[in-house]
Amino acid sequence: PNNPTGSILNINELKEIAKVCIEKDLYVISDEIYCELTYEGEHASIVQVEGMKERTILINGFSKSYAMTGWRLGYATGPKEIIAQMTKIHQYAIMCAPTTSQYAAVEALAHGDEDVAKMRESYNQRRRFLLHKFDELGMTCFEPQGAFYVFPSIKRFNMTSEEFATRLLEEQKTAIVPGTAFGASGEGYVRVSYAYSMERLKEAISRIEKFVRSLS
């Protein structure tokens, strides 16, 4: 799943990317930090495509799926010769992740699947809530298939995403991220995270609604 839109690539789209990579002899770095937070269907990875396992460096971690953001623990898998060179840099730049974090990660992998499933269902409920609310406000919103963000359009308000986000913060004390934080093509959109309680989201959307109504 993508940040900020929550969109995903299906296996057929990944196969098309793989064709180009194999033809041009390219390596792929695939950041799959949100893979466990896929709401509809199964997560697809480019390493599943024939011929791509040996040319893909897959990056993942525990921050999103296990809500271990502060533990700063991640991992990478890939071709042996590349991982060997990555290890040389890593061991002298960082040495290793704290042992406490490593033990916590082992427990998460061994016993955390049920918690991940519950968290995913909770995110899904919040996702549906925000999609419905933004639809009511007339803010067109792509339906995210993963992660925990929505990316509604603000184009009808005739202001930049930076201005919209700044004014919302100043006037309603509610923080969102302007779409341009993710590149020029994000202009006209804002990112809203639903990695909060439903109670907080209801308050946030109420403030966003007040702000939007004031622009009419």
Residue map of PLM features:
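PLP-dependent class I/II
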Residues: P1-S216
